[in-house]
């Protein structure tokens, strides 16, 4: 997959193989008509967990994205930022965007630090045990421009995002290659200024369908 395209899982970094904390979708979107977002997290283990959450602004949600400064200290807020989560319990984390209302799309990494509560309460003599029982999970939050301009071009099986907000694009229908079966489906996130050609679905076939989401609005393309 080309580097400039966003697959359905935008980014996942530093995750422990034995993940105890369920943070839901790896990528979340705050649409242009909303300034709040809620994510439900769940402790799927039989022991309490200490959860700490940190926010970082990114230049890009792709692998080469760099941490950059926020335009203002309270650009993106969350609550709670730290909590004790009992075994098999859930909690709703709320995010509030208070940044510029301009035409720029913004990207943030939500860093979840997950630690077994029993380990977190140990003294410094047992710090090595804490490290092995801890996890750092990275998910992505995309804040659509407050002044979103949704535009696209489609030709010969290729979609180009000519607007300023990320699109969710999809194709479904007959498979391009018989080895893939009869029916195929593709889903991607397409950033502003990028193009995507579908490689599994035969979009040239009369039964091939292409569509996209502009925020919460479904748009048939073909």
From Swiss-Prot:
Q: Per its UniProt record, what Gene3D superfamilies does this chain match? A: Immunoglobulins
Give the highest taxon in the source lineage: Bacteria
Keyword list, A-Z: Chaperone, Fimbrium biogenesis, Signal
Induction, as annotated: Negatively regulated by H-NS. Positively regulated by IHF and EcpR.
- InterPro entries the record matches: EcpB_C, Ig-like_fold, PapD-like_sf
**Which interval of the chain is the signal sequence?**
1-20
Entry similarity comment = Belongs to the EcpB/EcpE family.
Q: What does this protein do?
A: Part of the ecpRABCDE operon, which encodes the E.coli common pilus (ECP). ECP is found in both commensal and pathogenic strains and plays a dual role in early-stage biofilm development and host cell recognition.
Q: From the Swiss-Prot or TrEMBL record, give the protein name.
A: Probable fimbrial chaperone EcpB
Organism, by scientific name, is Escherichia coli (strain SMS-3-5 / SECEC)
Report the gene name: ecpB
């Amino acid at each position: 997959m080309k580097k400039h395209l966003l697959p359905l899982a935008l980014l996942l970094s530093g995750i422990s193989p034995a993940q105890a904390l369920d943070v839901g979708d790896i990528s979340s979107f705050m649409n242009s008509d909303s300034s709040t977002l809620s994510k439900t997290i769940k402790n799927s283990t039989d022991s309490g967990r200490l959860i700490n959450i940190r926010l970082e602004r990114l230049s890009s949600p792709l692998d080469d994205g760099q941490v950059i400064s926020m335009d203002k200290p309270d650009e993106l807020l969350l609550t709670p930022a730290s909590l004790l989560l009992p075994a098999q319990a859930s909690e709703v984390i709320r995010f509030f965007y208070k940044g510029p209302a301009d035409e720029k799309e913004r990207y943030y990494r939500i860093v979840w630090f997950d630690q077994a509560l029993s380990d977190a309460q140990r003294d410094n003599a047992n710090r090595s045990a804490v490290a092995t029982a801890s996890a750092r999970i990275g998910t992505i939050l995309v804040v659509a421009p407050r002044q979103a301009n949704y535009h696209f071009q489609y030709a010969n099986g290729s979609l180009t995002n000519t607007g300023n907000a990320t699109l969710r694009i999809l194709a479904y229908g007959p498979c391009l290659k018989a080895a893939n079966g009869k029916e195929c489906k593709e889903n991607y996130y397409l950033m502003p200024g990028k193009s995507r050609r579908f490689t599994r679905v035969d979009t040239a076939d009369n039964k091939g369908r292409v569509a996209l989401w502009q925020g919460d609005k479904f748009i048939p393309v073909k």
